[in-house]
């Protein structure tokens, strides 16, 4: 439904590239199959991926790349209209229908990153966390970060916990979030 598509766009569009050297990455890859809908965005530094089951698929599996600018409009339309979203693929264009509203955009052509090979298949680190709790913890740590004082949030994943911290000229912040599993000391910085 529209709320699902809207959140999929929101959660992947931040990684859409603005670099015109690779125009195909200035959009998001949509893969439709019996398994559901997968939306992928990449910008050379980040990869954002979201999967959801689909209510109904007509025809076989297909994929396309939609421009990021068009997806921003689709997201806005989904916010205003509470209807089912229909996606129709043409040879060079994509039609998004939300209620009485239609948006037609051109497909981006080119070879999109093979994201399935970019993500390691086997990973010795396996953790489970509550995303709501993690986001709340992240918000608490981010209070010392501003547009002027950009600094990464460092996350250290250990046995049953992740420690998040940020340091800027205006102060330091630290918070601990409970997880299931052992992060084996994995440290990640998020901008």
Model-derived segments and spans:
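Glycine-rich, pocket-lining loop/helix-strand segments that form or immediately flank
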Residues: 111
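DNA polymerase processivity clamps
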Residues: 1-51, 55-108, 123-191
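Specificity-determining recognition surfaces
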Residues: 114-115
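Bateman (tandem CBS) regulatory domains
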Residues: 118-122
């Amino acid at each position: 439904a529209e709320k699902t598509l809207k959140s999929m766009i929101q959660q992947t569009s931040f990684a859409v590239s603005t670099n015109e050297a690779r125009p195909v990455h200035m959009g998001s890859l949509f893969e439709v199959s019996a398994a559901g809908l997968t939306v992928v965005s990449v910008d050379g530094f980040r990869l954002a991926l979201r999967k959801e089951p689909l209510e109904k698929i007509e025809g076989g599996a297909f994929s396309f790349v939609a421009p990021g600018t068009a997806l921003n409009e689709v997201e806005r339309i989904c916010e205003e209209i509470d209807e089912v979203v229909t996606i129709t693929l043409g040879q060079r264009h994509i039609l998004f229908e939300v209620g009485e509203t239609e948006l037609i955009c051109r497909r981006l052509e080119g070879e999109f990153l093979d994201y399935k090979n970019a993500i390691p298949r086997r990973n010795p680190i396996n953790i489970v966390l509550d995303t709501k709790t993690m986001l709340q913890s992240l918000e608490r740590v981010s209070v010392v970060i501003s547009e002027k004082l950009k600094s990464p949030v460092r996350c250290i994943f250990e046995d049953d916990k992740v420690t998040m911290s940020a340091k800027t000229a205006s102060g330091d912040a630290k918070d601990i979030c409970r997880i299931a599993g052992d992060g084996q000391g994995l440290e990640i910085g998020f901008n």
